[in-house]
Amino acid sequence: MNIQSVRGFHDILGKDAKKFRKISDTARKILKLYNFEEIILPVVEYAELFQRSVGETTDIVQKEMFVFEDRKGRKLALRPEGTAGTVRAFIQHKLYALRPYVKLFYEGPMFRYERPQAGRYRQFHQIGAEVFGVAEPHADAEIIKIVYDILQALGIKGVVVEINSLGCKKDREAYREALLNYLTGVKEELCSDCISRMDRNPLRVLDCKVETCKVAVREAPKMIDFLCDECREHYEKLKNYLKALDIPFRENYNLVRGLDYYTRTVFEAVSDELGLTLIAGGRYDYLVEELGGPPTPALGFALGVERLMLLLPDEEEKEEVYFVIPFGDVHEYALRVADILRKKGKVVEYSYRKGGLKKQLEFADKLGVKYAVIIGEDEVKNQEVTIKDMETGEQRRVKLSEL
């Protein structure tokens, strides 16, 4: 049997690895500008954490979590998302006692048992940010601005930020009843998953991607019409702040997100070209308290790295690499030359190939290096190196002391 990677678990190589690193570096740079601190989370948590936070009735908990038992029979899970673990850490380490509000970001692999397709894997990578302790809508606007800044910095075009408000608990209760009454009337048009969702969490029907369900809910009551005065004011202020920040957005009253913990603001940065959600997030003002912490308003976002990679072009970026070619027994000198160049911040490839100069230079050309550094006995004797520009063919001798 040839050993292959597990279905849905992928290697990231070459140009894709460069795209991955570009996304990570860009997001980290922008999060640093907003003064977020990094938190490094474990990939394994108690399954109960996600059942209580993400929601028992969600597809993630019902169908997609990788759950297993440890040797003591305790149910553990590979994390399907990062917010729940960050909230758990916020409570466990009493971060709420340190300052009035806390801003954290994380990066790493997540795991969901989904059908693999373009931009969607069973192991995928997310970068996310969370703000704890701020209830005001200007925090929502700033979180969305971070998302917009990341996409702009990556040069991703054709992205729209969709927003909605899910209100508070009282708003949700009134809306749930009205929505359930409506869905009962169109029940025959719904898929089997949505019929079962009606009893558990009817809001999830609005998030269904099946075309017949999309048509069925077009005339459904809108959450926006059930917002209390306070939640409506929060939502209107958010829209004003987004306009002030010149962030293009559109309202999507069917946007509910796939996780049960969201309240008030929810948003998605969507690629219309791919039909994929690239970055998503929202408020979860009750989650900290529901998991055993003090009442703490909170909000955040997560971006899917692999999905963003689909939108980045392949870059033929040639690094200024120095390829050191030793001839004969000159390794002591050649290794020292390579070390000197690296200490000066140069990228150096030391040749391990055997063969004549022609073969070595052909290999250097194949690697796409900028310079070949040729070292033979004559160069050692004169304490020099021969540097060849691989693009122009120009060749010159340089003293070791002048490198």
Curated annotation (Swiss-Prot):
Listed under GO cellular component are:
cytoplasm
Q: One GO molecular function term?
A: ATP binding
> What HAMAP family does this protein map onto?
His_tRNA_synth
Matching NCBIfam families: hisS
Q: Which InterPro entries match?
A: aa-tRNA-synth_II, aa-tRNA-synth_II/BPL/LPL, Anticodon-bd, Anticodon-bd_dom_sf, His-tRNA-ligase, HisRS-like_core, HisRS/HisZ, HisRS_anticodon
Q: Does the keyword Transcription regulation apply?
A: no
**Stored PANTHER family:** HISTIDINE--TRNA LIGASE, MITOCHONDRIAL-RELATED, HISTIDYL-TRNA SYNTHETASE
Tell me where it resides. Answer: Cytoplasm
Q: In its keyword annotation, does this UniProt entry include Endoplasmic reticulum?
A: no
Its recorded name reads: Histidine--tRNA ligase
Q: What class of enzyme is it?
A: ligase
GO-annotated biological processes: histidyl-tRNA aminoacylation
EC code(s) of this entry = 6.1.1.21
- Family recorded in the similarity comment: Belongs to the class-II aminoacyl-tRNA synthetase family.
Q: What would be one Pfam family of this protein?
A: HGTP_anticodon
- Between which residues do disulfide bridges form? none
Task: Just give the chief location class.
Answer: cytoplasm
Recorded name of the encoding gene = hisS
Q: What is the lineage of its organism?
A: Bacteria, Pseudomonadati, Aquificota, Aquificia, Aquificales
